[in-house]
């Protein structure tokens, strides 16, 4: 029997927040096998780590900073919030491990997965799910390392830790304590079954083109997949990428097209999409978020793109971003053995960029997810990169929603 409990407190003082959390945990009768903890980046990681390790000595641990706090079935935690998701499953097996990524992220990811499997006493076995939380920037390399062990036979789902203002103040939390350039891997062998979904809240605008040149191609496990692939698009259809993209968006970058610089805010509603295939006749897209205009009109992105790929200009709005979160959660619940009637709770990864764009309407997102999960316990974090499984392949994307549903 699987049981989930969520606890959220909101207080700018880490010490006071943990005192509130302690009182709430005292009222919960559960012995978790896995503890997920996410929190506003302004909190003190060392205090949070000390609290969790003292309270849940034998549990696997995964967590880190989340942009602007967390959400749960109780609503939006908001600034200063800390959230715990406690997963109890006496008949299941869970393990976690954490590593600093170092110069070779793929190798380190592979090592972390083997360590997590050993911690679950399941060395050499295929997990039902791999859940990851990591520092942004080398997600493709991390997935490549994990795939050396499990291929695409096992879903890899998770997020990239975030801060509150995109200044690099993100951290990750595992059994060894807080990290700034780390990866936490959890392996789940649930006795109640797991459902999952990985989607976005955008649609094609109609414009598309071929990536004809990419920028510097990283080496040594830091992003090369197969073809020439990089996080900088230099040319689309033989023209400077930023100029083409600006035309596609109707000129939203006109003021920055020559000066260059950050374009995160301008592009949140106009990401690039890559066709990942059809499900029930509906095309699904992996999103790529352009974040900078560089030299000679190059576009820097938060996910790698291969030369020769057709990319689509996507468009979104607040309403779609609010509604889609609930739909993704519902899809994960329906994917459970026994469907949503077998639901014990869930874990939601919602892009921090989308969260910032939705703004004061974010309580509606939490409400939509809660309704789709039948008001069962869930925890939602806000990330700067999302990982998920779509059409039999594990991928990294931006501005995405990743949902995991746990069966009883």
What label would you give each PLM region?
Residues 1-55, 59-60, 64-359, 363-372, ...:
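Small-residue-enriched flexible segments
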């Amino acid at each position: 029997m699987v049981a989930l409990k969520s606890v959220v407190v909101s207080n700018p003082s880490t010490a006071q927040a943990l005192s509130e959390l302690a009182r709430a945990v005292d009222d919960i009768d559960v012995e978790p096998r896995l503890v997920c903890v996410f929190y506003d980046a302004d909190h003190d990681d060392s205090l949070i780590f000390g609290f969790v390790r003292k309270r849940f000595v034998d549990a696997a641990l995964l967590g880190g900073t989340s942009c602007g706090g967390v959400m749960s079935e109780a609503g939006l935690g908001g600034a200063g919030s800390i959230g715990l998701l406690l997963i109890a499953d006496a008949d299941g097996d869970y393990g976690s491990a954490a590593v600093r990524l170092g110069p070779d992220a793929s190798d380190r990811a592979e090592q972390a997965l083997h360590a997590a499997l050993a911690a679950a006493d399941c060395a050499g076995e295929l997990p039902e799910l791999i859940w990851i939380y990591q520092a942004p920037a080398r997600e493709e390399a991390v997935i490549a390392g994990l795939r050396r062990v499990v291929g695409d036979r096992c879903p890899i789902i998770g997020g990239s830790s975030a801060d509150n203002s995109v200044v690099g103040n993100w951290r990750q939390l595992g059994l060894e304590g807080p990290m700034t350039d780390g990866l936490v891997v959890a392996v789940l062998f649930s006795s109640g079954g797991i459902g999952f979904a990985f989607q976005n809240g955008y649609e094609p605008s109609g414009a598309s083109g071929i990536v004809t040149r990419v920028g510097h191609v990283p080496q040594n496990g830091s992003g090369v997949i197969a073809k020439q692939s990089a996080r900088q698009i230099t040319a689309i259809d033989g023209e400077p990428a930023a100029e083409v993209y600006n035309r596609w968006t109707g000129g939203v970058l006109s003021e920055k097209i020559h000066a260059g610089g950050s374009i995160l805010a301008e592009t949140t509603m106009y990401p690039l999409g890559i066709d990942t295939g059809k499900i029930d006749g509906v095309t699904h897209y992996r999103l790529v978020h352009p974040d900078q205009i560089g030299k000679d009109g190059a576009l820097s992105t938060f996910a790698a793109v291969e030369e020769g790929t057709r990319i689509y200009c996507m468009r979104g709005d607040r309403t779609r971003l609010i509604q889609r979160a609930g739909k993704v959660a519902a899809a994960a619940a329906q994917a459970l053995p026994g469907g949503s009637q077998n639901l014990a709770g869930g874990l939601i990864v919602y892009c921090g960029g989308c969260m910032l764009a939705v703004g004061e309407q974010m309580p509606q997102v939490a409400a939509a997810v809660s309704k789709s999960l039948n008001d069962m316990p869930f925890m939602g974090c806000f990330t700067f990169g999302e990982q998920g499984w779509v059409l039999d392949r594990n991928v990294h994307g931006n501005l995405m929603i990743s949902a995991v549903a746990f069966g009883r």
